[in-house]
Each structure stands twice: as structure tokens, then as C-alpha cells.
Regions:
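A conserved beta-strand element that flanks and buttresses the S-adenosyl-L-methionine
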Residues: 110
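Short glycine-centered segments of the SAM/dcSAM-binding site in methyltransferase folds
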Residues: 38, 137-139
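Short catalytic micro-motifs in class I SAM-dependent methyltransferases
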Residues: 113-114
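Class I (Rossmann-like) S-adenosyl-L-methionine-dependent methyltransferase catalytic domain
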Residues: 1-31, 46-101, 118-125, 129, ...
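Active-site charged/polar residues at nucleotide-handling catalytic sites that mediate phosphoryl
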Residues: 104
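Conserved class I S-adenosyl-L-methionine
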Residues: 36-45
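Conserved acidic residues
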Residues: 107
């Protein structure tokens, strides 16, 4: 197993890390991400998706937040290996969305394979965080499990299945509008596992 594959085991299957990395930056660029944008990666983990984004965005425009120090430390090793320290990404370890204030308004906010690892109360706090930090013309993208299946655990996190209406209500509570884009498979995410490929990508914007 390669060093990168072993590192990214902290965020998903070793065999899929490159596909998922490529998928994220491709999706974001196709949906308007520019180097000049302020961008936040919610649940950035080991920077599986973050490395190419840090390379693409202007210096210091990438923000990555995570609750796991081990994952962030592995991400920092990846930055060194890729020669990206000078890109000055903002990597932030935190414990609670309710007290996290970055003092930045983001053009693009992204949570890839994160929301379905949050209990309902934490998901609520996450959306409040998003509402505080999204710019007037900003956008938040997130993929979710909207099919009913048996819930379980992944590492120390729950795996929850909630209909998109749950997220629509959170959006309304925070003056955001929600749009369902399509399944990840339709966007080019091909893992040959319907649990991932049939997840739905959602888009949220300020309700102006």
C-alpha cells in the first residue's frame, strides 16, 4: 500500500482515494470555483480533496477544518510532500461548530461525505456555522445519504440516513435555500458501490 493510500485510510477506502480526490476538484471547478475564491473544506481530514484545491486556489484562500488532530497532522505531512506549505492553507482543529468563528465570509463552502456522519444536533450547529460564514453570493455544496438503510458507524462517527427534507428544514431555519443537484454517480463519482454513488449532492445559497 502506498504512503498516500495508507494516509487516506483515515477518511475512506484506500482503493478509492485518488478517484475521490479527482472527483472533488473536478466538481468544484465545473461549478464555478475560481482561484480567487475564499474556500472552506468542512471535515477536511487528511486533505485527500484538499491537496489539489490548495494548489489551485490563490495563496491562503483554502481553509480546512476538522475535529481529528491525527487526520490534520497527516494532511500537513501531505502538504510537505507536495511542496505546498508556501500556499499557506489555514488548517484548523476545532471541537464545536457553535463556538467556531473564523472571521471570514466564504465564496464556496464544501462538506464532502461529512453531513451523514453528524448527529442531528451537530448537523444543526453545522448549518448555523454555515449561515454565519457564507458570503452574500456564496454557495455551500454537500453530499448526503437520502435512502433509508440501517444506520451504523464508521471509525468513531455515526453513519446516518436522512431524507433531503431534513436538510431543507435546516436550510430554512438559517435563511438558506436548498436545491438537489443529482446523484454523485451522475456527476462522475464511480466507485461501483451504490452506498456512495447514489448519494445526492445538494446546493445551498442565501435566501436573499
Amino acid at each position: 500500500m502506498s504512503v498516500k493510500a495508507k494516509r487516506h485510510l483515515l477518511v475512506g477506502p484506500a482503493s478509492l482515494w485518488k478517484m475521490k480526490q479527482d472527483f472533488q476538484i473536478k466538481f468544484l471547478k465545473e461549478n464555478g470555483l475560481l482561484p480567487t475564491h475564499k474556500f472552506i473544506d468542512i471535515g477536511c481530514g487528511t486533505l485527500r480533496g484538499g491537496i489539489p484545491l490548495i494548489n489551485y486556489l490563490n495563496t491562503a484562500n483554502y481553509y480546512g477544518i476538522d475535529v481529528r488532530e491525527e487526520a490534520l497532522n497527516e494532511g500537513k505531512k501531505g502538504l510537505e510532500e507536495e511542496g505546498l506549505i508556501a500556499r499557506d492553507p489555514n488548517l484548523i482543529l476545532f471541537e464545536d461548530f457553535r463556538v467556531l468563528d473564523l472571521g471570514v465570509k466564504f465564496d464556496v463552502m464544501f462538506a464532502f461525505s461529512v453531513l451523514f456522519h453528524l448527529e442531528d444536533s451537530i448537523a444543526k450547529s453545522c448549518f448555523e456555522f454555515i449561515a454565519r460564514h457564507i458570503s452574500d453570493d456564496g454557495v455551500f455544496y454537500a453530499n448526503v445519504n437520502d435512502k433509508t438503510q440501517s444506520e451504523g458507524k464508521w471509525l468513531e462517527f455515526p453513519v446516518v440516513y436522512r431524507g433531503v427534507e431534513f436538510y431543507n428544514e435546516l436550510a430554512k431555519d438559517n435563511n438558506l435555500t436548498m436545491k438537489t443537484i443529482c446523484t454523485l454517480k451522475e456527476l462522475g463519482h464511480i466507485s461501483n458501490d451504490d452506498r456512495g454513488d447514489l448519494q445526492v449532492m445538494l446546493e445551498f445559497r442565501k435566501d436573499c
